[in-house]
Amino acid sequence: MDKKNRPIGFFDSGVGGLSVMKEAIRLMPNENYIYFGDSKNAPYGIKTVEEVRTLTFNAVESLLEKNVKAIVVACNTATSAAIDLVRSKYKNIPIIGIEPALKLATKYNRKGNIIIMATPMTLKEKKFKSLMEKYGENYDIVSLPCAKLVEFIEHGILSGEELEEYLKEKFKSYKNNDIGVVVLGCTHYPFIKETLYKVIDKDIPIIDGGLGTSQELRRRLEEKNLLNTEDKKGSITIINSNGSEKMIELSKKLIESS
């Protein structure tokens, strides 16, 4: 197979990375995609760094066995814990990670706090701390750990009273005029954006790193002359460690959602 026609591998602790892959599909519809969701071991955000590193290397190995031409670690927690180690081990393949879209958030120039919703591990790791050092002096940045949110989404709960109550509890300390921008620092979270807008004002920007990551993926593929040149819609393959048809169905539903 021509190297350009080989698939792009995406990996996440569960279904969250599909929010990033959707952006990549919009940007490069003729590419072939393989998605590996590790729902059996979700959520990653409450595990130890060593556990997350082991799971990340396992996922990368399984994608390499599928002959992928690039890998997107579409998981903020795995990026925080393992991306540097993964890149140093696999030097011959583009490996793209994801970070909270803090740089983008600062460009909105709105009064109020920049609130970053993320898993506890993402907020503790050095990658996030270096982002805070870069932007923390000039902007009011608030970390909001949301440990349980991934579990809602992994169970297909994207709306409803229980989720709304959880989000209300998280935001109870902030009035709408206290909030400048909300940054979704976990790839699962874009799927509950509409429910979040029932809790905060609709004029508050909610942003994530999905598009920026997909643009970086395209740039890296172009740089390596790996962009697919075929003029037809590419294929999408979904694999989940959970092994259940239910997770595959949920994944398909999330890809097809607007």
Curated annotation (Swiss-Prot):
Catalyzed reaction equations: L-glutamate = D-glutamate
Matches recorded under InterPro entries: Asp/Glu/hydantoin_racemase, Asp/Glu_race, Asp/Glu_racemase_AS_1, Asp/Glu_racemase_AS_2, Glu_race
Associated pathway: Cell wall biogenesis; peptidoglycan biosynthesis
Alphabetized Pfam families for the sequence: Asp_Glu_race
Record EC number: 5.1.1.3
Signal peptide range in chain numbering: none
Keywords per UniProt: Cell shape, Cell wall biogenesis/degradation, Isomerase, Peptidoglycan synthesis
Any one Gene Ontology BP term: peptidoglycan biosynthetic process
PROSITE patterns: ASP_GLU_RACEMASE_1, ASP_GLU_RACEMASE_2
MF term (GO), any: glutamate racemase activity
Family of the protein in this entry: Belongs to the aspartate/glutamate racemases family.
Protein name from the UniProt record: Glutamate racemase
Lineage: Bacteria, Bacillati, Bacillota, Clostridia, Eubacteriales
